[in-house]
């Protein structure tokens, strides 16, 4: 990766772990889902309008996917959330039940123009 591929940190939203990198590919998102599941964390989806993303709590899509071991189930929920909220940012969270905090989170969908 060259320095020209990294966005200017002063002119973009930094909403998640990978904000300064190019958007993740579908395979990279899949790998991150596998990582969350392998850590024993519960995947959960959050969504919010881009204009409110940095100063509001994000709404949760359904409930966290407690006990999910299949990354394809998580991908299906991401797609369902995207279809229901096509103009919202969608973030995947890996919730750690033991420490009761987020172990990982990143944006999996940005609407056009973001």
UniProtKB/Swiss-Prot annotation:
Disulfide bonds: none annotated. Coiled coil: none annotated. GO terms for molecular function: ribulose-bisphosphate carboxylase activity. Gene3D superfamilies: Ribulose bisphosphate carboxylase, small subunit. One of its GO terms (biological process) is reductive pentose-phosphate cycle. It is found in: Carboxysome. RuBisCO catalyzes two reactions: the carboxylation of D-ribulose 1,5-bisphosphate, the primary event in carbon dioxide fixation, as well as the oxidative fragmentation of the pentose substrate. Both reactions occur simultaneously and in competition at the same active site. Although the small subunit is not catalytic it is essential for maximal activity. Encoded in a cso-type operon. This is Ribulose bisphosphate carboxylase small subunit 2.
